[in-house]
Regions:
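Extended interfacial segments that mediate partner engagement and assembly in macromolecular machines
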Residues: 1-65, 90
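PRPP/pyrophosphate-binding module of the type I phosphoribosyltransferase fold
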Residues: 70-153
Length: 153
């Protein structure tokens, strides 16, 4: 737990390659042949500036190294909403991310199947919203993979 939180909030990236290998192995095992491209849940420009990095993008890129492919940027976070980690109620978490993302290029999304990468899943609100946006932009399918799951799940 401490290592993941240090990675997410303090940019402690010494375990990044191991995380990428672990996620690549799990994705191949669980989702083999179910996706055409790999993408990630982005952070807002404001959070990127504050934190200095996008942890889900880094996880996605690390996973893609193992497969000799490039991640595809599909989503843009258009609203710097309060951090999900500070919200406990699942309904409030869903409302907090509603409308926070938009497709970067719907034409590049249409008809493709995506593996969507995020760092930690708690209630699934963020992933659900990102899947909704990708499918509304024409994605044929979206499967999700996270590095960790919150204890309550």
């Amino acid at each position: 737990r401490d290592a993941l939180l240090a990675f997410k909030f303090k940019r402690r990236i010494e375990d990044l390659n191991a995380y990428g290998v672990l996620m690549a192995e799990k994705a191949a095992e669980v989702y083999a042949d179910r996706f055409d491209a790999v993408t990630w849940v982005p952070v807002s420009k404001q959070r990127l500036k504050k934190r200095g990095f996008d942890q889900s993008r880094m996880l996605c890129a690390s996973l893609c190294v193992d497969w000799h492919t490039e991640p595809q940027e599909t989503l843009r976070k258009v609203r710097d909403n309060p951090a999900q980690s500070g919200i406990g109620d699942p309904a409030e978490r869903r409302a907090n991310v509603l409308g926070a993302y938009e497709p970067v290029d719907p034409d590049a999304i249409a008809g493709k199947r995506f593996l969507l990468i995020d760092d930690i899943i708690t209630t699934g609100a963020t992933l659900t919203e990102c899947v909704r946006v990708l499918k509304a932009a024409g994605a044929a399918d979206v499967v999700c993979l996270t590095l960790a799951m919150a204890r309550d799940n």
